């Protein structure tokens, strides 16, 4: 509902099946509200942000559905301290193809084992994306992470 989107302060691009290219309406929403509202992307929503920022989303060699992995904050982040390591819940078969270069999107977190990007930020436009699921019981301090994301 367009009226609800216009009235909200935050837009969450949610997890789901498939690939970002399967959801052209989500791309339109992202492009319309980027820089005007806080946008948070989780899993498919994270991939949707990258897809719209000229990232290539590809099939992973290994599928992670219901896996817990350690992630490391690798760059300065508005949300997390650099070098912090914690466990997160993963449910995905797609990933960002690298190398990826962007003037406005910064990779802030990576899988500690595989080095796959796990979080992005665009502080200038108030955009945050997470390949992992902060709402999952597999994510350490998930409720705290969600509160931090929403209050940033």
Label every model-predicted segment.
Residues 68-70, 117-119, 129:
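Conserved hydrophobic/aromatic beta-strand scaffold that supports enzyme active sites
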């Amino acid at each position: 509902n367009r009226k609800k989107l216009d009235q909200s302060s935050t837009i969450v691009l949610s997890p789901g099946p498939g690939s970002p290219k399967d959801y052209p309406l989500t791309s339109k929403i992202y492009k319309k509200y980027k820089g005007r509202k806080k946008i948070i992307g989780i899993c498919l929503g994270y991939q949707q942000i990258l897809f719209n920022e000229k990232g290539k989303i590809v099939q992973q060699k290994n599928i992670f559905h219901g896996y817990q992995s350690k992630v490391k904050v690798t760059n300065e982040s508005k949300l997390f301290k650099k070098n912090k390591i914690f466990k997160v819940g993963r449910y995905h078969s797609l990933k960002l193809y690298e190398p990826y270069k962007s003037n406005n999107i910064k990779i802030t977190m990576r899988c500690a084992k595989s080095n796959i990007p796990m979080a992005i930020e665009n502080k200038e436009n108030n955009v945050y994306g997470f390949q992992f699921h902060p709402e999952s019981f597999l994510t350490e301090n998930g409720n705290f992470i969600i509160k931090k994301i929403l209050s940033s």
